[in-house]
Amino acid sequence: MIFSKERYKIRIIKSNVNIILNFGKILIQKNTLLWISLFIILMIGCNSQSKVAYSSEEIINISKIFVNQSKTFEFTLTHSNGYTLLPGNLNISKAKGKIQKPNKILIDAEIISNDFLLKLSYLTFDEKFWITNPISNKWGGIPNSDNPFKEVNPIQIIVDIITKIKSSEIKSYNDNSYNISATIISNDLKSLVGDMIIPDKSVKIELSILPNGEILKVNIIGEVQPKDTLDTIRIIKFYNWDKPIEWKEPLIK
């Protein structure tokens, strides 16, 4: 009988110990979940605060410095519902180019002329100008007076856009880039489209800019030239900032 009582007491003690241990585990789990929840809340709070570290004016000023200090870049120009008209009734549908300040430019363009799609390349540096024959694709030297690109200045395009935009506003912050909407007067886009513009027209633009000021993309939306529509969008993408570019005169046969 004595042994039975002792065993009974031992069982009660073990049961109480197990209850305490299980209760302790529950508390630990709850505390762990509590700490994890607090950590997640803090991280979300920090991320939401760090998403927009600059105002639109601040990020544009940073971008001005970045653009002014950059010596080279590459770009592409495409269109949605339109094209860019150059002298000689040349309608650029697509173009890509390489730029080195102050005066080195290479452009490869697809041009629609008299309902024909033509491809030509244009190169200039050291006050010399070359262009390819759209039929033979062979290079030839040209005087600047015959240069179809003489009214545009790709080197100046991004400078004009970033320095002359107005009413800028951050619309979103995605993939570590600021998406900004703004307006610009059509006269300030002559470096892109030349003199064939609708004067004094307020034009909507959208910019994607990295926190270091690097410009990824600019959308120019609406009417800039006489044949544009409200749905015309010029899409300019920039890349390879400050990467070395090799320049040499084309081989002319």
Map each language-model feature to its residues.
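Short, hydrophobic/aromatic-rich segments at coil-to-beta transitions
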Residues: 71-74, 101-108, 175-181, 214-217
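Flexible, processing/modification-adjacent segments and terminal tails
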Residues: 131-191, 195-197
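N-terminal leader/targeting segments and the immediate start of mature chains
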Residues: 39-104, 243-253
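Sec-dependent bacterial lipoprotein signal peptides
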Residues: 2-44
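Extended lipid/amphipathic-ligand handling interfaces
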Residues: 59-65, 94-101, 120-129, 204-211, ...
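Gly/Pro-enriched, hydrophobic low-complexity segments
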Residues: 178-252
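An acidic-aromatic
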Residues: 96-154
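Hydrophobic lipid-interacting interfaces of membrane-associated proteins
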Residues: 78-84, 112-116, 134-136, 223-227, ...
